Amino acid sequence: MFSGSRRGLFLLEHFSMWLFGHYSILIVLIMFISILAMMAYYARRLRISEIVVISSLSAISVAARVLVFIPFFKPCTAVIIISGSAFGPAVGGMVGVLTGLVSNVMFGQGTWTPFQMFCWGSIGAVAGLLHLKKKWSAVLFGFFMALIYYGGIMNFYSMLTGGTVFNIYCYLAFEINGIGCDLIHSCATALFLWLGWEPFMRRLERMKTRYGILR
């Protein structure tokens, strides 16, 4: 007879095996959540000023990803965090979702796109909820969110699509294999936040005043 903990592990293992065989369900679910979040935001009555801000920041974030040619050394996560911190979770989340969707027109669309949309959208939303004010707090937030959160979810996606088994050991193997890329991404995010936080926030504060946008 199984103990409570062993029964839980037994059920988790069998659920994991089922999920590994039906990972497309998870991909569709994440895509649905990401698109639903976008639709829910746009369903409300938007002012022209809000559309201008979202479009402008999304264009900057997409350009930051496309025009920097060093693999994984991209400023877009930093731009998303700054957007959320300046304008709140709704704008930060939308900029993140659109960054993943639009930039992959250049990099290629695939089953990874909804995962990236979800990661960047939630990072922008959390940055907005935290209302980051200090540069150091933004740098630390960006470093760990890029390394642990974004990297963890994308490594999980890699395991779903490229792994032969589905368990914690397989996941750790993908984490170890991807640690170099994740460190480049997290260090780039921290560096661009350190260099761009103050000048970027000053310009966004003027934009908020100009368009009369309040958090």
What are these regions (language model features)?
Residues 47-50, 89-94, 133-138:
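Membrane-helix interface segments
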Residues 2-81:
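Hydrophobic transmembrane alpha-helices
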Residues 63, 67, 86-87, 187:
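Transmembrane helix irregularities
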Residues 62-77, 97-131:
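Interfacial aromatic-anchored transmembrane helix boundaries in multi-pass membrane proteins
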Residues 35-39, 76-92, 125-130:
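Generic transmembrane alpha-helix motif of multi-pass integral membrane proteins
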Residues 1-29, 113-115, 129-215:
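Membrane-embedded alpha-helical hairpins and interfacial helices in multi-pass inner-membrane proteins
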Residues 55, 59, 78, 82, ...:
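Residue-level signature of the transmembrane alpha-helical core
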